Amino acid sequence: MEIFKKASSIIETLKQQGHEAYFVGGSVRDLIIDRPIGDIDIATSALPEEVMGIFPRHVPVGLEHGTVIVVENGEPYEVTTFRTESEYEDFRRPSSVQFVRSLEEDLKRRDFTMNAIAMTEEGEMVDLFAGQEAIQKREIVTVGNAADRFQEDALRMMRGIRFVSTLGFSLETKTKQAIETYGHLLEHIAIERITVEFEKLLTGTYCVKGLKELVETKLFSHLPYLQMSEERLLKATQYNWDSFETDIEAWAFFLYCIGEEHPSVFLRQWKFSNKKIKDIVAVLLTIRKRKEKDWDTVLLYKTGIHIAEMSERVYEAMIESYDNTSVKRVQTLFEALPIKSRQEMNVTGNDLLNWANKKPGPWVAEMIQNIEEAIVQGNVVNEKECIREWLQECNLL
């Protein structure tokens, strides 16, 4: 409760001014489940203008949605006015938001009962939709009619399966049936929003369970490049996903499991950044090389430790070996390299020009590369005079 105590003064101040205020959302859910708590959110009957008038230190980040960031004890907290939403447009966003003075009206618009629990500053739960019962049963249940909730915002279906992966809960029967019925509405949702949820699914503690639900609800058939991937997705559930430490590894392994032959095309379709695409593809290419031969100094040097570690963890998952000794071996090999990057070489292009007494040209870059590989392979010591002598012995000067 310590994390909530730091924000309690906000609720107390709002109440002193005649308003209602409660902790709400994921932080309350995670407190009940006894999971690490992230951002603390507060809901209040005070209008945004009233919140800003009460708290001098604020940032008006989302006034149209009723959200003001209040800075208290050096920490930022989202304070949002109780609100209800009108008819939704395109199965993803409300056409308008109305501020209300009722906590119940605010909670009833939320996605799942476990996320619709409010808490007073004293720690008393306000549970109007049996959210605690759902948590006790480890079930994901929509607030009210599941069909209505998913037709309001189709992304909620993806969020539901993401929660299966992150919490290990199961979809309640009617909720699951509604996902099967309304899954096609996911095609109205921007792929960027789907990608965020899918990544949380892949990196969840119960990823295998989440992937199984993705198949059982047929939701996968409404996702880009996955329409025909049922058998391959089921194959993915046969592996252990626990060894991955980054989202890059999870995506690389996922692409391996579904047999994606054009990973760059897939990732661009899912709107990944160029940097992330580059890293994921680098891991997959490194694994291809790794299958052909074990690590040697040149391969490890050219790959770099970051990609090498990730590649090894994914490769270990592929061959179903999870003792982590191979990753440690890669780290040991890398630490033993004479140089870790070209910047550590004790020779420059100018040195070569002076020694060879030749005009600049492509030969300089080629010779630098030859020297670099020789240093990495241990054929020459990374000292200027040693490099010069080695070049002379090899008749390269």
From Swiss-Prot:
Q: Which UniProt keywords apply?
A: ATP-binding, Magnesium, Metal-binding, Nucleotide-binding, Nucleotidyltransferase, RNA repair, RNA-binding, Transferase, tRNA processing
Q: Which cofactor does it need?
A: Mg(2+)
Q: What residue stretch is flagged as signal peptide?
A: none
Q: Which residues bind ATP?
A: G26, R29, R110, D153, R156, R159, R162
Q: Does the keyword Transferase apply?
A: yes
Q: InterPro entries given for it? A: Bact_CCA-adding_enz_type3_sf (IPR050264), CCA-adding_enz_C (IPR032810), CCA-adding_enz_firmicutes (IPR023068), NT_sf (IPR043519), PolA_pol_head_dom (IPR002646), PolyA_RNA-bd (IPR032828)
**EC primary class:** transferase
Gene Ontology biological-process annotations: RNA repair; tRNA 3'-terminal CCA addition
Q: Which reaction does it catalyse?
A: a tRNA precursor + 2 CTP + ATP = a tRNA with a 3' CCA end + 3 diphosphate; a tRNA with a 3' CCA end + 2 CTP + ATP = a tRNA with a 3' CCACCA end + 3 diphosphate
Which additional comment does the entry carry?
A: A single active site specifically recognizes both ATP and CTP and is responsible for their addition.
NCBIfam families on file: PRK13299.1
Name the family: Belongs to the tRNA nucleotidyltransferase/poly(A) polymerase family. Bacterial CCA-adding enzyme type 3 subfamily.
Complexes and interactors: Homodimer.
Q: What is this protein called?
A: CCA-adding enzyme
Question: What's the source species for this entry?
Answer: Bacillus cereus (strain 03BB102)
